[in-house]
């Protein structure tokens, strides 16, 4: 221990950058992988953000990988300064997960949504509606870490995975859902309410599970 302390002191005296640079990198890594606790809102039909970041787009698209319907997609950009842990948008069961190998465009580019390496999740809510969530890599973020398993039951706001460094997360909602955020809003995964589903019996059937998922 004394030898290590002496070596550290000598390094600080002779070449401070030898210690400062690794220490700064270590501090950034620890800060980047932070996972702060979140207060998860309660209430029927509430959908919380699956990621920290900024809402970059809200649009109607054709979701062809899982539900084959027109959906309302909310895109969230995660900078390197955001928490990168992903959280479930609602109480749900994992009914689908698959990874697509692609390119590594900047996560803010429109091409990132369809061309970048990504992992798609299908989360079935208690009323049978499926929420589609995509973890999308970026120019820097090149690794998706899935934590949840197929058929696993998850509570709203529970951690299901992580994307390392700047990236994008998307959530696809039924057209009948009431979106409560706007482009430019900052959101927090697991705590910011981004939408409300219609009451049971009134929700449109555009995101009901396909027969092979039932």
Indicate residue ranges for each PLM-predicted region:
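Contiguous, well-folded functional domains in the mature portion of proteins
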Residues: 1-214
């Amino acid at each position: 221990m004394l030898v290590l302390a002496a070596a550290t002191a000598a390094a600080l005296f002779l070449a401070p950058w030898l210690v400062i640079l690794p220490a700064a990198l270590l501090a950034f890594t620890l800060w980047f992988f932070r996972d702060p606790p979140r207060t998860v809102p309660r209430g029927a039909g509430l959908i919380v953000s699956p990621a920290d970041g900024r809402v970059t787009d809200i649009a109607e698209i054709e979701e062809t990988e899982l539900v084959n319907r027109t959906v309302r997609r909310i895109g969230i950009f995660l900078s390197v300064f955001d928490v990168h842990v992903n959280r479930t948008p609602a109480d749900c069961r994992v009914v689908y997960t698959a990874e697509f190998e692609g390119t590594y465009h900047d996560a803010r580019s429109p091409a990132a949504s369809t061309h970048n390496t990504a992992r798609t999740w299908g989360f079935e809510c208690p009323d049978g509606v499926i929420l589609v969530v995509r973890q999308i890599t970026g120019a820097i973020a090149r690794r998706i870490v899935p934590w949840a398993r197929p058929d696993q039951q998850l509570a709203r706001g529970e951690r299901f995975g992580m994307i390392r460094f700047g990236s994008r997360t998307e959530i696809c909602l039924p057209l009948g859902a009431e979106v409560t955020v706007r482009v430019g809003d900052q959101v927090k995964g697991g705590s910011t309410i981004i939408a409300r589903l219609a009451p049971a019996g009134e929700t449109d059937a555009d995101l009901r599970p396909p027969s092979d998922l039932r």
